[in-house]
Amino acid sequence: MARYDRAITVFSPDGHLFQVEYALEAVRKGNAAVGVRGTDTVVLAVEKKSTPKLQDSRSARKIVSLDNHIALACAGLKADARVLINKARIECQSHRLTLEDPVTVEYITRYIAGLQQKYTQSGGVRPFGLSTLIVGFDPYTRIPALYQTDPSGTFSAWKANATGRNSNSIREFLEKNYKESAGQETVKLAIRALLEVVESGGKNIEVAVMTREEGVLKQLEEEEIDIIVAEIEAEKAAAEAAKKGPAKET
C-alpha cells in the first residue's frame, strides 16, 4: 500500500487525499438527508432505519438542535456526528456567554467546516466521515438559511439540497420541483424528495421544521408525517388520473 494511501496529510501523485475520499464514500453510504429553505420555513428530512421494538426511538434521532434557532442533520458515521455536534453546541454556548449574542447560521457553519478541514491535515486523527445540512434563521435579520458541509471542510449555501445515499437522484428531483414556497408546501417538498428513495413511506422518515414565527425546531410526530405522505400520494394519484384524461364511454 502506498504511503499516500495511509497518511491523511500526504497527497497522491495525481493530487488526491485518499483518506478524505474514503470519508466521502462513508457519506455516500449513509442514510439520505434533505434540507429545504422556504420563504418563512426551513425543513430537514432524514431517512431512518427501523428501530427495534425495545429501543427508545428518541435516542436514535438524526436531526438535532445546535442552538434554539439552528438545527443540523447529517449523513455518515453516527459516532463522528456525535463528536462534531458536541463541539458545535459548545461553540454556540461559548459565543452566547462571551458576546451575549447568539451565533448566526453562517458562523456556526464556518466553525463546523473549519473543524472538518482541520481534521484533514492534522496528525493522529482522521477526517470526519459525515456531511452535514445546517438550517436556521439569522437571529438579527430573521432570514432563513440552509448550508451544507462535507468531510473536506467545504461549505456552501443552498435553497434545497441532499446528502447521503442516492443524493444525486434526490437533488435532480429538487432541481425539477423546487419553487420558493412557504409553510406546509416547503415541508411537503422535503418529504416528496425523500420519498423518491425511501420505499417504506412515512414510517422510516424523520422530519423537523422551523418557522420564522415560532423560531424553534419542531420534530414532527409519525402520525403528522403519515398525514402529509397520504396527501402527497393523493395528489400524485390525481395528477396521474388527469394525465390519462376522462375514461372513454363504450
Curated annotation (Swiss-Prot):
Alphabetical list of InterPro entries matching this protein: Ntn_hydrolases_N, Proteasome_alpha, Proteasome_alpha-type, Proteasome_asu_N, Proteasome_sua/b
A Pfam family per the record: Proteasome
SUPFAM superfamilies: N-terminal nucleophile aminohydrolases (Ntn hydrolases) (SSF56235)
Primary subcellular site in the record, as a coarse category: cytoplasm
Protein induction: During cell proliferation.
Keyword Nucleus appears in the UniProt entry: yes
Source organism superkingdom: Eukaryota
UniProt tissue specificity: Expressed in roots, leaves and flowers.
Family in the record: Belongs to the peptidase T1A family.
Entry-linked NCBIfam families: PRK03996.1 (NF003075)
Protein name per the record: Proteasome subunit alpha type-7-A
Organism for this UniProt entry: Arabidopsis thaliana (Mouse-ear cress)
